[in-house]
Amino acid sequence: MKIDILTLFPEMFSPLEHSIVGKAREKGLLDIQYHNFRENAEKARHVDDEPYGGGQGMLLRVQPIFDSFDAIEKKNPRVILLDPAGKQFDQAYAEDLAQEEELIFICGHYEGYDERIKTLVTDEISLGDYVLTGGELAAMTMIDATVRLIPEVIGKESSHQDDSFSSGLLEYPQYTRPYDYRGMVVPDVLMSGHHEKIRQWRLYESLKKTYERRPDLLEHYQLTVEEEKMLAEIKENKE
């Protein structure tokens, strides 16, 4: 996968040199390039200006971003604008992006964008209902969530298939050594070696956590007969 990032602050992306994303780059599975669009600004390197019609704050000018975009070697990229007014990012969207060969992220700053910048864009995306000072942190979050889904980046595909949201439910509790720590012990079922009972326990705990913490996820989740019975028991025990 090739990722190009248009930003005023390329130095903010140093975390992408480490951990899973960094290893993907070392393996040649991922190429990330940064483009400081200030370097393409014609007007005394000014990238922002006052909005026509008046108003608070400054807007990013169209020319520096267009020229930076035009300079990128690309074929048919998905172009993502980080915008608080965009569609909210989620796991399904990360899985969709992981199928792409080329991504371009445009990171904003200041009050907003000249609207004409959006003619370059295929997707306008937000992390949530809050405002950041720029799009860099949002871009890094999206890149991390996407890159880990690329085949061969994480050793076992099941490692991310069991993650919260990948299945539509929150992830079940997990434990490792020691068995007993300060009186807190690992559930006996996980020590039993009985694979079917472990599967059932994990599914039950996953449903329970989702019901308690993110019941909204269940509104769009297609329950199996087994899951319906488990959820009914969970609700009954809560009453």
From Swiss-Prot:
Keywords tagged on the record: Cytoplasm, Methyltransferase, S-adenosyl-L-methionine, Transferase, tRNA processing
Record-level GO cellular component terms: cytosol
Subcellular location: Cytoplasm
Domain of life: Bacteria
Reaction(s) the record says it catalyses: guanosine(37) in tRNA + S-adenosyl-L-methionine = N(1)-methylguanosine(37) in tRNA + S-adenosyl-L-homocysteine + H(+)
EC class: transferase
A GO biological process held by the record: tRNA N1-guanine methylation
Residues engaged in binding S-adenosyl-L-methionine: 108, 127-132
InterPro entries noted in UniProt: Alpha/beta_knot_MTases, tRNA_m1G_MeTrfase_C_sf, tRNA_m1G_MeTrfase_TrmD, tRNA_m1G_MTases_N, tRNA_MeTrfase_TRMD/TRM10
EC number: 2.1.1.228
Main location: cytoplasm
Signal peptide residue numbers: none
GO MF, any single term: tRNA (guanine(37)-N1)-methyltransferase activity
Record's function text: Specifically methylates guanosine-37 in various tRNAs.
Family: Belongs to the RNA methyltransferase TrmD family.
PANTHER family: TRNA (GUANINE-N(1)-)-METHYLTRANSFERASE
Assembly: Homodimer.
Record-linked HAMAP family: TrmD (MF_00605)
Protein's name in the database: tRNA (guanine-N(1)-)-methyltransferase
Originating species: Streptococcus pneumoniae serotype 2 (strain D39 / NCTC 7466)
Lineage: Bacteria, Bacillati, Bacillota, Bacilli, Lactobacillales
Gene name in the database record: trmD
